[in-house]
Amino acid sequence: MSAVPSVQTFGKKKSATAVAHVKAGKGLIKVNGAPITLVQPEILRFKVYEPLLLVGLDKFTNIDIRVRVTGGGHVSQVYAIRQAIAKGLIAYHQKFVDEQSKNELKRAFTLYDRTLLIADSRMPEPKKFGGKGARSRYQKSYR
């Protein structure tokens, strides 16, 4: 039995982490075991579709994508998912298709939105003493 060609990539946003498994298949795209069409709300679903729509859905009829995402909120998870999918498509094309198609995908993703391939490293600033947040201070009384 021959192994199915597959790659595994990850995407991150704040504390959300998504791991995408891209392999040869029949065009299934699942997020946490559910079809991608069930991602709610609709605006966030379109964000998840962006990497696929940029280069055309017809190119991915022979690729299965399964994404497992944990941590963070809804929006952070969606951005982690789209990054994992974009990186997975590029890794799959580099490993199993050809270098030229990989470069075309990479160029299209970078021109559209750099965060599809490069993680946003910003994190919340830690809370300090003397206030209720990172920068805010408790009110001072002079008498």
From Swiss-Prot:
Query: Which residues are recorded as modified (N-acetylserine)?
Result: 2
Entry annotated with the keyword Acetylation: yes
Q: Where is this region: Disordered?
A: 123-143
InterPro entries registered for this protein in UniProt = Ribosomal_Su5_D2-typ_SF, Ribosomal_uS9, Ribosomal_uS9_CS, Ribsml_uS5_D2-typ_fold_subgr
Signal listed as a keyword: no
* Pfam families with a match to the protein in the record: Ribosomal_S9
Gene Ontology cellular-component terms listed: cytosolic small ribosomal subunit
List GO BP terms, alphabetically. maturation of SSU-rRNA from tricistronic rRNA transcript (SSU-rRNA, 5.8S rRNA, LSU-rRNA); translation
State the coiled-coil residue ranges: none
Gene3D superfamilies to which the protein is assigned, alphabetical: 3.30.230.10
Give the compositionally biased regions (Basic residues). Answer: 134-143
Q: Which residues cross the membrane?
A: none
Kindly state which keywords UniProt assigns to this record, in alphabetical order.
Answer: Acetylation, Ribonucleoprotein, Ribosomal protein
Q: Which GO terms describe its molecular function?
A: RNA binding; structural constituent of ribosome
Q: Report the sequence similarity comment from the record.
A: Belongs to the universal ribosomal protein uS9 family.
Instruction: Specify the protein name.
Output: Small ribosomal subunit protein uS9
Question: Which species expresses this protein natively?
Answer: Maudiozyma exigua (Yeast)
